[in-house]
Amino acid sequence: MSGNSSTDLYLFKKSLKELKGKKGKGTELISVYVPAGRRLSDISQYLRQELSQSSNIKSKTTMKNVQSAIEVILQRLKLLKEPLEMGVIIFAGMIPRGGPGTEKMEVYVLEPPEPVKTFVYRCDSLFYTDPLEDFIQDNEVYGVILVDRNEATIGTVRGKTITILKKLTSGVPGKFKAGGQSARRLERLIDDAAHQFMVRIGEYATESFMPILEEKKLKGLLLGGPGNTKNEFAEKDYLHHELKKKIIDTFDLCYTEEFGIRELLDKASDLLRDIDLMKEKNLIQRFFKELIKDDGGLSAYGEAQVMKYLEMGAIDTLIVTEDIGITRVTVKCNNCDITQEVNVKTNEMFKFEEQLKTKACPTCGGAMYIDEEKDIIEYLSDLCNMHNTDLIVVSTDTEEGSQISRAFKGMAAILRYKL
């Protein structure tokens, strides 16, 4: 059950981050995007033409590296089975490890989370990763408009991310104590200023949301704020008529800006139950409800306890934060082949490698070496699959995810039964 979208998305984001950090010595890194359903023989033929043309490159070193990268990609294409429902993305090239002469061929084959639509062949000093950014964008977007007499906030909720697009202030004056014609004149001025403010909000909302609507990604609009201003804004013709059709509901709020958006999401939780942000929030709240029980309920937390219970098959749902930063390392003896598995903080891997050089095998005294390194979330995903456990990778951009990261070192769980 662990092979879920949150784990796949985390690993895809991690690969993207690594790829963006790669840089070639010259324009010799190859990026190939193969569209879904495209015949691999057509792609191979195109690459062979590029291989032939690369002989015209003036620099012998660059020519050799480009040709090596194309040949590696051709070899990888032979290993793929058709049809490719999602397509495939391949990166290859010589990446320097240090000074001149330290270059090493690196190749990455990615299965995209969504179908590749367009064929791309690019040779550059960097891998071409721009299309990958589109894959990690959540397709369902909710627009948010918070409005009161004095200010307004326009934003979006996309997956786990809240983005404030625009903050506006009205300049509408407060009430004055005046009588007769002065009172009526001031009232007209205030009403006109309020009307103009609503017009501005509508214009910015149209500018912000119409492009998303045209891409068919706008799931709906949520309006909120204190008082009656939001209702007036919703009922009158301040919004583009196509956006008015997307209004889901209006909500009474105490705040505007980001606090207001979070308050609105709480109040709209039943409507938004399916979006990632609410799923995450509800799951973590479920964990905390167990935690505060007198006997700790069905909660577990911390690396040691969670790993123990997971290997026992006692965990129903495992919660891990994206920033956990741990690598699962398999250490092996070069003499007797005894192995050990340990968790190492990713930013301390160099220190661990240096310390390992001075350690001897506990069985035969032989030298120890690192046999395998694996991202802890990928390792946990495999374990969860074995034990029918749900693995949810949560963002630390949310308040709840940040709590799991800070208080429980990025790892918490809900048990199947009391231990």
From Swiss-Prot:
It comes from the Archaea. GO terms for cellular component: cytoplasm. Transmembrane segments: none annotated. The keyword Cell cycle does not apply. Its main location: cytoplasm. Pfam families: eRF1_1, eRF1_2, eRF1_3. GO terms for molecular function: translation release factor activity, codon specific. InterPro entries: eFR1_2_sf, eRF1_1_Pelota, eRF1_1_sf, eRF1_2, eRF1_3, Peptide_chain-rel_aRF1, Peptide_chain-rel_eRF1/aRF1, Ribosomal_eL30-like_sf. It is found in: Cytoplasm. Belongs to the eukaryotic release factor 1 family. Heterodimer of two subunits, one of which binds GTP. HAMAP family: Rel_fact_arch_1. This is Peptide chain release factor subunit 1. It comes from Methanococcus maripaludis (strain DSM 14266 / JCM 13030 / NBRC 101832 / S2 / LL).
